[in-house]
């Protein structure tokens, strides 16, 4: 079969532009999407990648929109239920443990309650 559509994951703006140039030079299928983490706690996509995506017409497939559970409301106030993913794999979660994480999660939680929404709906 033929490759008709190409996408990248976890790439930088520089990498995306290099892939676009390579596909043009070699007459490869053009990249159509980029899959990167994106949530209210991780907005790094907005620094460079969003501009490249818009200008080059590349779709964004966001993953971890609820920050792997942080924005669901179940990890509020540094409470990590026994047997939860946070409890089982503490090192993995360092990407979300920042000085303002708990404060941000609490603000999002309060917004959801104010508008009678479940926490995850307020973070979509």
Model-derived regions, located:
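Beta/alpha (TIM)-barrel catalytic core signal, keyed to glycine-rich beta->alpha loops juxtaposed to Asp/Glu
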Residues: 1-124
């Amino acid at each position: 079969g033929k490759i008709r559509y190409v996408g990248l994951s976890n790439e930088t703006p520089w990498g995306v532009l290099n892939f676009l140039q390579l596909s043009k030079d070699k007459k490869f299928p053009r990249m159509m999407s980029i899959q990167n983490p994106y949530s209210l706690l991780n907005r790094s996509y907005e620094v460079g990648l969003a501009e490249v995506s818009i200008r080059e017409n590349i779709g964004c497939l966001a993953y971890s929109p609820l920050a792997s559970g942080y924005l669901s409301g179940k990890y509020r106030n540094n409470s990590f239920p026994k047997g939860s993913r946070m409890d089982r794999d503490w090192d993995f979660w360092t990407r979300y443990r920042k000085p303002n994480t708990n404060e941000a999660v609490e603000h999002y939680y309060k917004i959801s309650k104010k508008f009678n929404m479940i926490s995850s709906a307020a973070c979509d």
